[in-house]
Structures are given as C-alpha cells and as structure tokens.
C-alpha cells in the first residue's frame, strides 16, 4: 500500500480543528524505525510571519514541519517551534540540502547551518533539494555520517 505524505498549507486558510484530533494523524514507520506523521505543514513562501504560523500550526496539532534552507526562513521556523512550547521530541522536522551545497565541506556547512538556524540538535529528515547528476553519492554519505552522529 502506498502512503502519500500530505503537506497542508494552512497559511491564509481558515482551518478549525483541535489538537486532540490532530494527534490522531496516522504515521508511517520508516526503515530506521522512526514514525513520520502523514500530515504536516509546509513553510515554502512563508517569510515575515513564519514563526507565528509555525507556532500556531504546532499548537493546533501539526507535528511534521517541512522547511528548507532555500526557503530562507529556517530561523523563523525554529523560533516558531520554540514558541510553541511543545517538546522537540514530539515533532518531526524535515529540511533540505540545496543542490548548490552538494559537495563535501559545503554539505556539512549547510547541515550545521540548518541545525543552528532551527535551534535543534537533530533533524528528523534531510532531503536533497532537486538532486542533479554528480555529488549525489558523496552527499548521501555525509547525510549518513550525520545520522550516525545523531544529528
């Protein structure tokens, strides 16, 4: 059975829900044993009020937060996470490494910047944003290195 991860863009939408119902969102068990919510909130094109919107999304029950360095809002997303008051371990944070960062040292710098900007010790899922030919294996190996370090 295929499961589709639905990213809900709640910005500007009138969504009425309660956190108790949102906590019933089904999860997908990943190969490493982690549970990933099937419903999350995306932060693409969210700039000025990203912290407020992320905080609100978490307070109404969203637990998967999707962002990327290329969105230019990881600091604000991290601020929203902190403001929510929800324990980090209850959240599933996804970010992305830009194609332009797909080289040894720059991958590490990119990941370290994301960790710092998000204000977290670890990221649950890191994707390669628009992977292109070349450096994919090297980038993948560095991502595995960060997993082994618990980051």
Which residues does each predicted region cover?
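N-terminal binding-site loop/beta-alpha segment at the start of enzyme catalytic domains
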Residues: 20-91, 142
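Active-site beta-loop-alpha junctions enriched in small/polar residues
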Residues: 44-46, 68-70, 96-100, 128-131
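Glycine/proline-rich, positively charged
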Residues: 102-151
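Sec-dependent N-terminal signal peptides
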Residues: 4-15
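Residue-level recognition of the N-termini of beta-strands and the immediately preceding loop/turn
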Residues: 89-93, 123-126
